[in-house]
Amino acid sequence: MISVATAECFTHGKIGVKIHKMACGYKEVEKDPNYSIINGNVFVMASMFLPSKKGIESLLDVKLPEPDYVFKYSKAYTQENDILVAKIVANALKNKLNCDIAISSTAGIGNGAICILTDKKEYNFTSEVYGDLIKGENILKRQENGINKAFDTVIEILKKEYGLK
């Protein structure tokens, strides 16, 4: 079985939950065309929504850069720093849980960033939707796009790296 763990911010843990539902055989997702790739082959070790710097640092034993923006209790970075933070968090998650696939997401001002780390490769990408956490612009559209793009990337990884069909 392939182990997956997520530490998510702007995707609110929904990447991990979607994978978990398929892995566990929830009826509501049986008709998804990728159901058979995940069900019986993958399990989710952890799916975490971690919006705060302190939460990430405490749970994953990692130091993050100071946020670029002040936003309530959440961290908010520039696009450039979102990419850096997503990589840091995915690496810390993989090291902490020793999972096969670690997924991390973060977004402040910009398109956000997602890092998927496997034993073979690091995949870094953004959503296709610009959003601004501080102003509350396009947050849900960016989230939905990020979840879908990350899930599609996980499916491609399972096919290419693990030979699942």
Curated annotation (Swiss-Prot):
InterPro entries to which the protein is assigned, alphabetical: HcgF
Organism superkingdom: Archaea
UniProt similarity note: Belongs to the UPF0254 family.
Protein name: UPF0254 protein MmarC7_0182
